[in-house]
């Protein structure tokens, strides 16, 4: 088995255990297509004992907000976030899908009040596996494909 060689980052975040093929979506929802001069690395289809294949995203000079971690949980509920300081892992945690998703997802119902009024979107998690959420306002249930296209 070939060894994966990736340059270490001094400060930043490593998102590991992303299901294979979803790393680009993580980069997209975090608006990282143009990093602030730091390293942005996507390793795709890397061997994983846990998942078989996985993606890894390394972001130099960026630490994730709670909202960003919640977004990642909707795309990659198996992901692990590593906070790197002075070339070492200072903190490590698994993402968790919150019970309520507030302000980060649009309702797929074009007639929903959240798409026409100045109200913050709000969804309740109905199921984590498979992922399903229900809109607080119109009660529409959305499944993973709709969730991903409305982030």
From Swiss-Prot:
The species this protein was found in: Thermococcus onnurineus (strain NA1)
GO CC, any one term: aspartate carbamoyltransferase complex
Protein name: Aspartate carbamoyltransferase regulatory chain
Any one GO molecular function term: metal ion binding
Functional summary from the UniProt entry: Involved in allosteric regulation of aspartate carbamoyltransferase.
Upper taxonomic lineage: Archaea, Methanobacteriati, Methanobacteriota, Thermococci, Thermococcales
Similarity annotation: Belongs to the PyrI family.
Keywords associated with the record: Metal-binding, Pyrimidine biosynthesis, Zinc
Protein encoded by which gene: pyrI
Endpoints of the signal sequence: none
UniProt: Zn(2+) binding residues: 107, 112, 135, 138
GO biological process, alphabetically ordered: 'de novo' pyrimidine nucleobase biosynthetic process; pyrimidine nucleotide biosynthetic process
Cofactor note: Binds 1 zinc ion per subunit.
Pfam family, one: PyrI_C
Coiled-coil region: none
Quaternary structure (record): Contains catalytic and regulatory chains.
Cofactor: Zn(2+)
């Amino acid at each position: 088995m070939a060894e994966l060689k990736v340059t270490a980052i001094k400060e930043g975040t490593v998102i590991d255990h992303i299901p294979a093929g979803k790393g680009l979506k993580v980069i997209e929802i975090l608006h990282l297509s143009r990093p602030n001069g730091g390293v942005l690395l996507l390793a795709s289809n890397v061997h994983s004992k846990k998942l078989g294949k996985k993606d890894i995203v390394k972001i130099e000079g960026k630490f994730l907000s709670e909202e960003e971690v919640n977004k990642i949980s909707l795309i990659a509920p198996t992901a692990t976030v590593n906070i790197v300081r002075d070339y070492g892992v200072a903190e490590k945690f698994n993402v968790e899908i919150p019970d309520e998703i507030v302000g980060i997802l649009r309702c797929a119902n074009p007639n929903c009040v959240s798409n026409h009024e100045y109200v913050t979107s709000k969804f309740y998690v109905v199921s984590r596996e498979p992922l399903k959420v229900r809109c607080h306002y119109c009660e529409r249930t959305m499944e993973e494909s709709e969730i991903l296209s409305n982030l």
